């Protein structure tokens, strides 16, 4: 008696957690850099180099990559002319501070896969003394513990003497797990209104309006690489240049069904900006390189035939059931959250003359369940580079955190629903209303996918059943009154006959029965 089965590749989420990690490090300025007077601008990002899982202990190893623009304490005779700006010297530091952090993710084991997503929620660089900086910040961490496994579903028994109750089950089959690095490179030329580049001072790079589509054997990732460049001109003026270039990259993956379901997460991996000569030999071109770490999955939604129950009228056998988790798609929902906020710089003594550019990031603070979906709360972080009224150093950067909240509709959620949410910036515009008041307009894209992980009983094998000496079962002919919740299949199985035999004896045209119906059953 052979059991015919089908294996279905699944990825089961076991546990997830969201937490924050604080860091506080001292940074000693290298000997080739002058003393610091004041920090003007700072920005950074988190880079994860290695993830090690030992039971429930997760070790993260990486670094905080940061950039600092500062003014030096004094200007000495003999300094290069391009290094003097309005009586102060502007210096740039780009470095990384390594870190290792231990986190606990309860419920995972050695065989599980751990996914980690990080973001830099806050970064503050302060001056301790002329040779030392304090670098403080908060890292947000998303942890997902999951296991890839094969669900073996019984589809039929290759035996004509066995009665089989067939059914259907919707499953989400994992076709491909995607993990790749997407590299982006653009070469842009300064507008004619901008002077030539003497030295790059700072660069802020981020990705916006990211979208992806699945097309049979690949995922197409499109978006816009946004960069704000601060440089020193040949006339010793600080200049800013903002550029936004579109890109499109293909990520190869398994699967040949155009209707497959894709889910993709991206994280910034690196960026680099260099000044290059144009065709005339002038330093008027910028080479902008960036990389995105891509992680995701491709599923196909299938309806498979399953064997729900079986018995034999000729020999005493019974199915062996085992409880397993079956993954299915509940909903994939993408929504937009529009943000409008007016802000006032109360404590600033410098008047803003012009906003040069921005760097943005959207992070999730909390996800709460609602009646028919979830409420996503987060923060839109905007770093603004400004030209200010200051002859000593006419550039500064300030960071604003604008909260947002959006309801995402996911009807049918219950305790077995696993929901993953990704937020990213589509558009941001900062308008200067006066010298101290400005307006932030933005659009944040919120992508949510809800998977249902229900526990079901599936047949895994067939074994011999002990024979019963019950007199009712030994009787050749039985009269039976249908009880509440009775089904024709259960009655036929109990008395070792067939549904067709009961219908024929009782002159029934269907297997539909109701309580108090009277049936004559002939045991086979």
Sequence positions of predicted segments:
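Interfacial loop/beta elements and low-complexity acidic/Ser/Thr-rich segments
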Residues: 1-472
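Primarily a LysM-type cell-wall glycan-binding module
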Residues: 467-504, 509-524
């Amino acid at each position: 008696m052979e059991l015919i089965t089908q294996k279905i590749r699944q990825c089961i989420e076991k546990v997830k957690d969201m937490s924050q990690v604080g860091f506080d490090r001292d940074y000693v300025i290298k000997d080739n850099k002058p003393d610091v007077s004041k920090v003007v601008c700072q920005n950074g990002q988190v880079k994860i180099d290695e993830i090690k899982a030992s039971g429930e202990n997760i070790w993260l190893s990486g670094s905080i990559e940061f950039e600092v623009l500062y003014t030096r304490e004094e200007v000495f005779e003999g300094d290069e002319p391009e290094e003097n700006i309005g009586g102060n010297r502007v210096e740039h530091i780009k470095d990384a501070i390594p870190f290792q952090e231990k986190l606990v993710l309860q419920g995972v084991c050695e065989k599980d896969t751990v996914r980690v997503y990080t973001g830099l929620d806050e970064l503050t660089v302060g001056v301790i003394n002329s040779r030392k900086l304090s670098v403080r910040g908060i890292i947000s961490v998303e942890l997902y513990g999951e296991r890839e496994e094969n669900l073996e579903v019984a589809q039929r028994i290759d035996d004509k003497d066995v009665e089989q109750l067939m059914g259907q089950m919707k499953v989400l089959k994992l076709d491909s797990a995607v993990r790749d690095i997407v590299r982006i490179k653009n070469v842009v030329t300064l507008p004619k209104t901008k002077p030539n580049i003497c030295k790059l001072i700072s660069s802020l790079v981020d990705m916006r309006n990211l979208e992806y589509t699945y097309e049979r054997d690949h995922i197409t990732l499109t978006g816009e690489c946004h960069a704000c460049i601060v440089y020193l001109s040949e006339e010793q003026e600080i200049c800013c240049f903002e550029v936004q270039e579109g890109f499109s990259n293909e990520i190869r993956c398994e699967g040949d069904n155009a209707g497959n379901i894709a889910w993709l997460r991206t994280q910034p991996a690196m960026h680099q900006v260099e000044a290059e000569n144009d065709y005339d030999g002038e330093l008027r071109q910028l080479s902008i390189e960036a990389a995105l770490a891509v992680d995701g999955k491709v599923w196909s939604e299938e309806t498979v035939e399953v064997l729900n129950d079986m018995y034999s009228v000729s020999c005493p056998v019974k199915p062996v059931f085992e409880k397993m988790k079956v993954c299915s798609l509940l909903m994939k929902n993408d929504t937009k959250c529009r943000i409008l906020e007016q802000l006032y710089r109360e404590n600033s003594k410098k008047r803003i003359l012009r906003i040069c550019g921005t760097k943005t990031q959207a992070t999730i603070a909390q996800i709460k369940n609602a009646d028919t979906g979830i409420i996503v709360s987060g923060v839109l972080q905007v770093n603004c580079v400004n030209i200010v009224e200051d002859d000593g150093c006419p550039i500064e950067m300030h960071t604003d955190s604008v909260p947002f909240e959006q309801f995402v509709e996911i009807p049918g959620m219950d305790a077995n629903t696993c929901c993953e949410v990704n937020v990213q910036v589509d558009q941001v515009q900062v308008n200067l209303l006066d010298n101290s008041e400005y307006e932030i307009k933005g659009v944040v894209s919120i992508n949510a996918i809800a998977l249902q992980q229900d526990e079901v009983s599936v047949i895994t094998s067939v074994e011999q059943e002990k024979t019963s000496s019950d007199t009712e079962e030994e009787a050749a002919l039985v009269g039976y009154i249908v009880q509440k919740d009775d089904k024709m299949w259960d009655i036929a199985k109990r008395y070792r006959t067939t549904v067709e035999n009961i219908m024929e004896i009782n002159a029934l045209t269907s297997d539909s029965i109701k309580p108090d119906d009277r049936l004559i059953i002939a045991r086979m």
